[in-house]
C-alpha cells in the first residue's frame, strides 16, 4: 500500500482497497476539486479532507461510519423539544449560508477552506450537493449539507448556533429522506456525536457494495426542489 499522487490531467482514482491503514483510509493526494473529480470520488466511496495549507488529501476509511435513517436515535428530551420546536426547516434555500456556517462554526478549526466552499457551491449549482437549513424566525441557526448519490446521501458537515438546531436538521431530513425512498446516510468517520445519533461502523467493502447499488437508485424528480420541510406549530 502506498500513497498515490493524482494527476491534474486525469480524474481517475486508485481502488479504495489500496488505502493506507495508518492514517486510516488515506488513499491519494493532489489533483483538484473540480466537479468532475469530486463526483468521481463520491461514486467510488472517496472524499476529500485536508487542513488549510496542505495538499488535497483523499480518503476511504475502513470501517466506514453510516447512519440508517430509520435507526436515528432521538432522545426523550429531543422528542419533547421537537414537539414544541420554534424552528422552521427548509431544503436548498440557502446552500451558501449553510456551508459558510459549517466553515465558521468549528472551534477546533476547519478543513472547509475558501476553495472547498467554492467547489461544493459548484456541485450545488449542478444539482449534486444539497443543504438543509434550520431557521428561528428569519435567522439561520443551524443546518447540514452533503452530496447525493441516488438513494444514498453523503453527509459532509453540520453546524448549530442554537439549542438542538443541527439535530433538528438531521431529524427532519431523515423523515423526509425515508419517506421518499432514501436508504442510507454516509457519515464517513464515526465520532461521539454521530454515534450518539445512531451512526455505526461497517466494513468498507460493505459500504462500497451499498454505494454501487444505491447510487443507481432514484428519488422522486422533485425531491431536491427548494421547499419547506417543517414549520413550528402555531
UniProtKB/Swiss-Prot annotation:
One of the record's GO molecular function terms: leucyl-tRNA--protein transferase activity
Any one GO BP annotation for this protein: protein catabolic process
GO CC annotation, single: cytoplasm
Keywords (A to Z) from UniProt: Acyltransferase, Cytoplasm, Transferase
Gene3D superfamilies found in the cross-reference section: Leucyl/phenylalanyl-tRNA-protein transferase, C-terminal domain, Leucyl/phenylalanyl-tRNA-protein transferase, N-terminal domain
EC number: 2.3.2.6
Entries under InterPro entries matching the protein: Acyl_CoA_acyltransferase, Leu/Phe-tRNA_Trfase, Leu/Phe-tRNA_Trfase_C, Leu/Phe-tRNA_Trfase_N
Domain of life: Bacteria
Family: Belongs to the L/F-transferase family.
Protein name: Leucyl/phenylalanyl-tRNA--protein transferase
Organism, as annotated: Escherichia coli O6:H1 (strain CFT073 / ATCC 700928 / UPEC)
Taxonomic placement: Bacteria, Pseudomonadati, Pseudomonadota, Gammaproteobacteria, Enterobacterales
The gene coding this protein: aat
Amino acid at each position: 500500500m502506498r500513497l498515490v499522487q493524482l494527476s491534474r490531467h486525469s480524474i481517475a482514482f486508485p481502488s479504495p482497497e489500496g488505502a493506507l491503514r495508518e492514517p486510516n483510509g488515506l488513499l491519494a493526494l493532489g489533483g483538484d476539486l473540480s466537479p468532475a473529480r469530486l463526483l468521481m470520488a463520491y461514486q467510488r466511496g472517496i472524499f476529500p479532507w485536508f487542513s488549510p495549507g496542505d495538499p488535497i488529501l483523499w480518503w476511504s476509511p475502513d470501517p466506514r461510519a453510516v447512519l440508517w435513517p430509520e435507526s436515528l436515535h432521538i432522545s426523550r428530551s429531543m422528542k419533547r423539544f421537537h414537539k414544541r420546536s420554534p424552528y422552521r426547516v427548509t431544503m436548498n434555500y440557502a446552500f451558501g449560508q449553510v456551508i459558510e456556517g459549517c466553515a465558521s462554526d468549528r472551534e477546533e478549526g476547519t478543513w472547509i477552506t475558501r476553495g472547498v466552499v467554492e467547489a461544493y457551491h459548484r456541485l450545488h449549482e449542478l444539482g449534486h450537493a444539497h443543504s438543509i437549513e434550520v431557521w428561528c424566525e428569519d435567522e439561520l441557526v443551524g443546518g447540514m449539507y452533503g452530496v447525493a448519490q441516488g438513494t444514498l446521501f453523503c453527509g459532509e458537515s453540520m453546524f448549530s448556533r442554537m439549542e438542538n438546531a443541527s439535530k433538528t436538521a438531521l431529524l427532519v431530513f431523515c423523515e423526509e429522506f425515508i419517506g421518499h425512498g432514501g436508504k442510507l446516510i454516509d457519515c464517513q468517520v464515526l465520532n461521539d456525536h454521530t454515534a450518539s445519533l445512531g451512526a455505526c461502523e461497517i466494513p468498507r467493502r460493505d459500504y462500497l457494495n451499498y454505494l454501487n447499488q444505491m447510487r443507481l437508485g432514484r428519488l422522486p424528480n422533485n425531491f431536491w426542489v427548494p421547499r419547506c420541510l417543517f414549520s413550528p406549530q402555531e
